Amino acid sequence: LYTILNNREDIFAERVYAPCRETGRLLREHGVSLATLESDTDIVKTHMFAFAITHELCFTNVLYMLELSGIPLRAADRGDDLFRWPLIVAGGGCAIASEPLAPFMDLMLLGEGEEMVPELCDLVIKAREEGWSRSRLIEEAVNIPGVYAPSLYTHDANGVLTPLKPDLPTPGRRIVADFDRAAYPEKQVVPFGAVHNRLSL
């Protein structure tokens, strides 16, 4: 995804990682927001903040990173102004089982993102150019196969996901069907610094 998005001229995809507790404490003490690795851009200044959820133990890191970024944890507390806060998105292998994160996410991406993420980025670009509200963007995004908006669904007495509006699609997992045309990373993402750049005693 990093390569796919950065090969486009209209998108900059940058990385950010959950800092250790000591670094998190220092960020809080000095009033410094969590920022991207490549350009040191504050997360609150980005248009979309997406998490790769690899397993359930990542759930608390998501909230930790939102808090360090100064972004309201709950999606309902971010208001309807698309330009005030980044769109908060979760994807990755464990997103299909990430319902505990539903109150905190604007969108969840279920399945393979190689086609889905660029489609969502196109929609975000269009929404910002045309001045959409956050709620309109979320409602439009669920028409992209694989995109699930927790705020537009509820659970019935049996725990089955139920749409709040009759015309909403049923969320499903997106799969890249044509591997012959699928993107393949030509350059691996590597760290900026050497891991073993210190003396071990």
Language-model regions, residue ranges each:
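N-terminal [4Fe-4S]-dependent radical SAM core
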Residues: 156, 160-201
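A short beta-strand-loop structural module common to alpha/beta enzyme folds
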Residues: 9-22
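Histidine-anchored nucleotide/phosphate-binding helix
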Residues: 1-7
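Glycine-rich beta-alpha loop elements in corrinoid/cobalamin-binding modules
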Residues: 19-165
